Each structure stands twice: as C-alpha cells, then as structure tokens.
Amino acid sequence: MKNNLRYGIRKHKLGAASVFLGTMIVVGMGQDKEAAASEQKTTTVEENGNSATDNKTSETQTTATNVNHIEETQSYNATVTEQPSNATQVTTEEAPKAVQAPQTAQPANIETVKEEVVKEEAKPQVKETTQSQDNSGDQRQVDLTPKKATQNQVAETQVEVAQPRTASESKPRVTRSADVAEAKEASNAKVETGTDVTSKVTVEIGSIEGHNNTNKVEPHAGQRAVLKYKLKFENGLHQGDYFDFTLSNNVNTHGVSTARKVPEIKNGSVVMATGEVLEGGKIRYTFTNDIEDKVDVTAELEINLFIDPKTVQTNGNQTITSTLNEEQTSKELDVKYKDGIGNYYANLNGSIETFNKANNRFSHVAFIKPNNGKTTSVTVTGTLMKGSNQNGNQPKVRIFEYLGNNEDIAKSVYANTTDTSKFKEVTSNMSGNLNLQNNGSYSLNIENLDKTYVVHYDGEYLNGTDEVDFRTQMVGHPEQLYKYYYDRGYTLTWDNGLVLYSNKANGNEKNGPIIQNNKFEYKEDTIKETLTGQYDKNLVTTVEEEYDSSTLDIDYHTAIDGGGGYVDGYIETIEETDSSAIDIDYHTAVDSEAGHVGGYTESSEESNPIDFEESTHENSKHHADVVEYEEDTNPGGGQVTTESNLVEFDEESTKGIVTGAVSDHTTVEDTKEYTTESNLIELVDELPEEHGQAQGPVEEITKNNHHISHSGLGTENGHGNYDVIEEIEENSHVDIKSELGYEGGQNSGNQSFEEDTEEDKPKYEQGGNIVDIDFDSVPQIHGQNKGNQSFEEDTEKDKPKYEHGGNIIDIDFDSVPHIHGFNKHTEIIEEDTNKDKPSYQFGGHNSVDFEEDTLPKVSGQNEGQQTIEEDTTPPIVPPTPPTPEVPSEPETPTPPTPEVPSEPETPTPPTPEVPSEPETPTPPTPEVPAEPGKPVPPAKEEPKKPSKPVEQGKVVTPVIEINEKVKAVAPTKKPQSKKSELPETGGEESTNKGMLFGGLFSILGLALLRRNKKNHKA
C-alpha cells in the first residue's frame, strides 16, 4: 500500500511538473517568436554602403530611415537608450507587420540621416520593446513606430543586411539611395578649417570704375561697374586660410544669373584660391594647397559689380563700396534705366528677371501701362523669337494688377509681386483670355486697358541654343477711334535677349591676338630670387577644354536675397573659366579697357567673321575693316527710328550669357510705322590695334549727308589693286569692281567668258545706301586651248537677304579655278556656292555676309568635253543600321517564392537563395517546406535543445542565420506578393520546436495525472 501510494505521489509530482514546465515553454517561446524581428543591433546607414556598427564598442548610434514606397510612405523612428543589464527581457504588446526586402528592380528612394538622434514626438500605433544583451552588458531599447502600413506597399529600394560573422560582432548595412542628395549635402556641410587672414591682407591699390572708366552705368544696356584690387599678403599662408571683403547692398556679382559665383584666383592655370558668395554681400576667397611655402605674395583681382534692381529702382547717383580689412573703396556712379517703348496712349517695358542655364529656364517681367485715354481690344503676346523649344512645356504666366501710382513704378522693371499692397493677382479672372503654347509663347486679351498690368513669365528655352530672344508685343486701339478699328491701331514691341555661345577664337583672327596677362608674384622659402607666374592666354577659350559646359559658366544673375538683378537686351557674357591668375580672375572688367557707344563689334572671326563698328563716338577704337556710317534718323519722313544700343561683352569664361538691353521696338500708328532699331555692341577687353596698308584708290561718296568710307579691301592675298572703279550715284548705289584676270597663251577657237554675280541678287540696304563690293576674278588660262572654252560663275543665285540694322554689307571673294595645260574640245566650269544658302541673322536686324570660295586648281591635259562642277552642299550620310542589342549578362531564373498564409502571425518560409552574380549561377538551397504553414530550417543550422541555456554575451544563432539570408536576396523581375510581413529572423524554427517540446511535456504530465486519479479511484 505504501509502495502504491508512493508511486502515485511520484506520478502526481511528475505530472504536475510536466504540465507546468511545458506550459512555460510554450508561453515563453511564443513571446520570443513575436519579438524576434526586432531583436538585433542598431544599424547605422552609411552613404557608401559600408558597415558602420561594431558591437565591440559600447557606442550607440541612431539611424532614422524613411523609405518611399510606390503607394504609401512608411517610416520608422528608432530611439536607442542604454541601460546596464545582464539579462534578456522581452515585452511585447503587438507585433507589427513585416516589410519584405524588395525583389523587383525599382528606383532607389531611401532617405537616410547619419548619426542623428531623432527627437520627434512619436505617435505610436504599435510599440515593441526588446532588451538584448551584447558583450558589454548594455541593454538597448528600440521603439519602432510605423506611421502607415498596408499590405500593398512595395519598397522601391533594395535593403541589404549583412550577416554577423561572430556572436560578438554585427555589421548590418543598408544601401543608400541617390535621392538623398540634400541630406548628403547637409551632412557634408563645408566647415572652414583654415584661419581668417583678412587682417594680413594689405590693399595697395583699390578702385571702382563705371562703364568705360566713367561714372555712369546703364544696367539695361548691359553695363556694370568693376572692382579692381591690388593686394599684398603677409607670409605664412596655408591651405584653407581665407580672407573676406564686403560689397554694398546696391550691387551684386551675378546680374540675372541664378548661379552666384566669383572667379578663381589663378597663377597661370594653377588655382591659388577659390571664391564664393556669402550672404550680406560678403565675398570669400580660400587658398588651396598651392599657396604653401609662398612668401611675398601679391595679387591683382577684378570683379564685375552689377546694379541690384531691387535696391536701386530709380535713376540717380549711387555710392558703391567695398571693404577689405577695414579699408573702404568707394565710387559714386550715375545709374540710368531705360523707359521702355511707348506712344501717346500706352507704354510697354520689360526685362529678363532670372536666367538659369542649369535647367534651361528663365523668367521675364513686363509692364503694360496706359498713358492717355482708354485703349480697347488690347492683345499682349510673349514669344520666343530665338531659342524656342517647339516640343517643350507650357510656360507659367501670372497676371497682376498694379495698385499703386504709375509714377511709382520701378524704373528698374522690378516687381515684388508678393507685396499685396501694390500687386493684386488677377490670373484666375483672365484665365479665359490667356492662351499658352508648348513652344513657350503666350497671348493675353484685355478688353479695356484702363489699369497697369504686370505679366510675370516663367518658361523654358531649347537646350543647346546659343541665343535666347524674348519679344513682348502689344496691339491696341484707342477707344475714341473705335470706328476706325482696322485703320487706327498701334503696335508696341519690346525685345529682351540673351546670347550664349562657346567661342573658339585662337587669337590669330582678323582683329589680331587677344592676350590676357595675369600677374602673380611670390618667393619660395628655399630660394632667393623672385619667381613670377605669367599667364598668356586667349581671352576666349573653348569651354569643353576647361569645364563641362553643362554647369553654366554664366557669372551673373539674380540677387542673393532673391530679388534678382538683370539687364535687358542683347548683352553677351562670356566667362573664361581658366582665364585669370590671382590678379584678374576672369576678364570681368572688359568695358573699362575698351568700349563703344553703338554698333556691332565681334572679337572672334570663327563665330562672327566680319568685325565692324557702327559708332559716332570719337573715342571709340576702330580696326582696318571698319565700316562707319551715320544714319538719317528720319529718311522717309514717315518713319520714326529710335536707336537703342545692344551691348555684347566678353567675360573670361568660354560659356556665357548675354543679359541686357533692348532691341527691335516697333510702333505703328495712323498707318505710320514706328521702328526702334537695335544695334548690337560687343565690348571686348583689349581689342588689338589693326595695322595694314590699303593699296588702290579710296573713294568717298557723300550724298544726302550720308558719308560712306570705303578702304581698299584687298583680294585673297591681302593686296587690293583697282584699275577700274565705277561710281554710280543712282539711288545711292555704289558699285566697286576689281580688274578682271588676265589671259596668257595661244587660244584657238571661240573664247567666251561669262560672269553673272548679280543674278537674282537681292537688294542690300545700309542706312538708305547700298554698298556692294564684289571681288571676282575670271580664271587665268595658260597654254593652248582648242575648241570652245566657256567659263560660267554664278555665286549669287538665290542668295538670301542679309540685314544688319537696316544696313546690308556684302563682301564676296570668288575665284574661278586656274587651268593649265592643253585642253581640247569644250571646257565648262560651273560654280554655285550660294545656291539655297540659308539666312543668318545677328542681333536684331544686323547681318553680315562674308564669303570666301575658291574652286580647286585643275592641271594636266584633258581631251574631250570637260565638265567641272562644284557643289558645296554637304553629302547626305546614310543612316547607320541599328546594332542588335546583345544582353551583356545572362539572367538567372529565380525559383518562385512559396505561397504564404494570410495570417500575419504565421511565419513565411525563407525565399530560396538566388546567386548575387548572374555570371556564376548557384543552385537554390534544397530545403523545400512540406507544408506552406510550417517553417523550414535553413541549411547548416542545428536546433537548440530546450535544456541548453543561452550563453551570456552572445547573439542568438538563428537571428544571425536569417540575417545572412536576407542579405543574399537579390532583386528579381518576378512579381512579388503584395503582402507585407516581417523578415524571418531565425528564431521561428527553434521557437516552433521548443513549443512542440513544451506541448509534449504538458500532454505527458496530463497523462500521468489522469493515471494517478485512476489509481486513487482504484
């Protein structure tokens, strides 16, 4: 009896213990399963993808990662705290849905912040806390707060997590997206490590000069001031040292450009210091490592100063200052703006506000102001005359009503449309009258022009164009003359233009070499003599040889505070990116060295072959090939011509912009035409003196107070011999022809020479005068010729018209080939080099035609009929057939992922491994789950026995193995399930086995208890 009782008690204890132990195992392993996803070390995301977490140290790093999804955005804010603990505690309220690593190739859209603790207030929807231990015994608490989570989210960026190699070292990493440029710039913000050496700079010479060394500046004509410094530095300069100087707020260094920059300081081609524009008008230059070991350093610096239209809105005197090391350089300049174009009834004015070459966009402001009476049926149009993108996007046009007095309108054509006290937006009210086109044009209809309106335009231009010309035109009809609607209308036209080009002048062109000498003197510490750096280089260079032209080398545009400085009209700015040694950074002070009042002057023959000036200024420079004339401002009596100067100037960089004045203003009233002529002026730093001798007579023909001077323009070899000069004073037409070529040798048969250089030749007008200069030489024939010899030359057939501000200049150099030897039968030589020649237009209506055509020389003995034809039309190259695309790398098929049950708590079997490199395919892991609902153990994993405790200071092995699998997953093109789930961490498999083991314990215990009860009953 005692044995039975003892056996029953033993069974009772064993059964109760089994039930208790099994229950604890089941409950404990279940919680461990839920918390496994968050039980890992804090991961730091690095931009280069390198691992940044090392468990050997006790440092804590925090990473906030925002992942952009296709449908919604989910972000996790992780906060890490350290608490000393030697135990692992798990507390779970709810397990969040897992987000799978994407397996489709999508654009990267992950934004990361490196080593920055997130201080935002969390709005927890799911809170999960895991306390795991590392080798230092620290406890880390991680809060994951998903803002939104859907099963349809698909990440666009691959996330790779590296497997920990040891139990005490874990280095997960996440690939960084290209969309984090802003965060990258923020983390890599430039920090000055050098010393401020402004106090060590001595200003030996400092000056501010106006346009052409005057005290006047016309911003709308592209004029600006120039700051000149000659500086001396104390010894001991090092890399990173910098000095500052500050400009007054009425000027800036960028004009209408959105790019704010200043030229580099160079010694030859070596950059000694880089410049940057800071806030508050401060300019900073930072020395490079080339300044090391230099003593007795002196430098010269020149910087363009543009009048700020936001600060200086009216005409008048302005004091411009620059302060360096407490020494102030100042100059008082007279600023004058243009008034636009207008008549008795209305006025039209406009200017380019900003210009951004980086994205091919610009903005423009136009003022439409009524003067006297009312004008009805007004149409305002904005058109890109040059640089239009026919397949572009529609511009953004906003209409504002000006609420102030017309007398208070800024002369600088500046409009602060954010000031609601002066500007009221009425775009929505006029939406039915506003028409926008994809080519960048717009049209606005105004029923009654009884208020002043401002039209703000923001559009794009054609990428790669060398000129942008935007025309604003207004057509109106005075109200009191409405019955004469078709006869009494008027038109106002206002042009604003920018010229961008890459000039390839080599310095050996028509105007001679353009050399810029930059001085940078210093001494080395190790030698006694002085070393002088000399930089002799063409002012204009090829931009491709210096910098990538896509980065816009325009120097000047909008103000720092966003107001925007600008100039109207054709103002050409060329920046030479490697043009200045420390003394002259680019050629920023071109107008101070050589200037003109009006006309058109080109410094490079390659891009503009004819250089001439149209000027009445007595101090302007002239060259040997200048054509100078005076224009009757009212030749016909019914035409009113207003001349506005268009200024083109060269900067030191190859790529540049033209910002500036007005061109092509037309007013028509009472059947009379009002025309504003635009003359393009290019200001070049130092245009070389042109020397030479003209042979032959020089004729001066004066008629109707028109003075036309012709020099002896030579033939191709540089000499002009004129034995026959015909002067025809009919309709002011002057024809100058050179002598015909000579004949030598014996000629048999009929010899016929025909030359028709005037067939279908259009009229060329130059200020009411036609100047026609032809140089045509009939071929020189040597030897015996038999048969009929015929030479025909027609170099002017179908030649288009060339206009240059109403003035046409035509210079032809045509030579028929020289034929030597014996020729029999008929010889026919035809040349037509101008057939269907396209039209070229420079500036507004200014055009230049320069032709040099020489046919090849023919030598030898020819029998039979000889026909020589030359057609300069470029051959048509047949298109190259497309090369068939060959895949560079074979694609490795990816086995489909097993289907997963819909319950979020059911674990998903791991995806079979896919080789990371296509060229070395590897078979997937052989494990295949028996049932979709049950997990499959990964390869090389030993399940833990429940009785074996986890060692202190080591990471659980299942987590490590699963991390490796996540890393091995490569993106595939197969569609993925839209279900979101947590990544498998490896704890799942051991958890299930533990739960099974615990369940068996419980069942065994219950069986023993039941048997014990039966024994008691018995």
From Swiss-Prot:
Keyword Signal among UniProt keywords: yes
Chain spans, region Ligand-binding A region: 37-511
Region Disordered: start-end pairs: 38-61, 78-195, 595-622, 740-813, 827-997
Cell compartment(s), UniProt: Secreted, Cell wall
Further information: Fg-binding activity is not regulated by the divalent cations Ca(2+), Mn(2+) or Mg(2+). Deletion of the Fg-binding domain of FnbA abrogates the ability to promote cardiac valve infection and persistence in vivo.
Organism: Staphylococcus aureus (strain NCTC 8325 / PS 47)
Pfam families, per database record: Big_8, Fn_bind, Gram_pos_anchor, SdrG_C_C, YSIRK_signal
Reported effect, F306A: Significant reduction in fibrinogen and elastin binding
Signal peptide region: 1-36
Propiece residues: 986-1018
Region (4 X approximate tandem repeats, D-3 repeat has more fibronectin-binding activity): 745-878
UniProt main location, coarse: secreted
Motif stretch (YSIRK-G/S signaling motif): 7-18
Organism domain of life: Bacteria
Region spans: 5 X tandem repeats, Pro-rich (WR): 879-948
Motif LPXTG sorting signal: positions: 982-986
Biased composition annotated in UniProt, kind: Polar residues: 39-61, 78-92, 129-139
BP terms from Gene Ontology: aggregation of unicellular organisms; cell adhesion
Residue ranges with Pro residues bias: 875-938
Residue numbers spanned by region Fibronectin-binding: 512-872
Protein name as catalogued: Fibronectin-binding protein A
Modified residues (Pentaglycyl murein peptidoglycan amidated threonine): T985
